């Protein structure tokens, strides 16, 4: 088999480059799984202001440290819930923030967020045009489907993806449910993951048996089962 034939040449490659050479070949890869926020679509600072806007919509007092409290409760919710539900999340905010937050709070909040996207990125569109001509592309994101689909459409990249998998339909990453669905109809060695969060995207994919591309400019971790890229556009060099 090709693995045995390549083993003789292993001295010419570092261990990382060897794994990458073997798994990065377009003769093997058939599907690419993408994370969404901070991977395909940059995170805007204005998104934080949408919390205050939602408080104001419901006439809920917004105190000086409100966002930090809200953010911590959101982290706790994500930590303790494998699957997301808007009404359940709204109640979790109400019970843990201690204010009269209605059951439709998250509906309104995510509605604001879904309309807030950066200007279209022509370079990203060019990359996705190239990748979608060679591979099946899928999004796997730990958030709500209606918001993420809206963002993909507004950003002008929805058409490039065959599936949008979200954590209101499947247990969130790094659990295996979303990876299982994303790999349906493919062998694991035919699928790679691209993401910016080590725990949910990269380690989750590795634990499931996938090779990954880790989008980061600050994390110095390296490994045999993932390749670090500093820009999403770097994928064109490898896939």
Give, region by region, the residue ranges found by the protein language model.
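Surface-exposed cleft-lining segments at the edges of enzyme active sites
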Residues: 110-117
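An amphipathic alpha-helix signature
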Residues: 47-55, 86-91, 145
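Active-site neighborhood of HAD-like aspartate-dependent phosphohydrolases
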Residues: 21-69
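A metal-dependent, Asp-based hydrolase signature
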Residues: 60-61, 75-109
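Asp-based, Mg2+/Mn2+-dependent phosphohydrolase catalytic module
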Residues: 2-13, 18-32, 125, 129, ...
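Structured helix-beta-strand junction loops
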Residues: 133-134
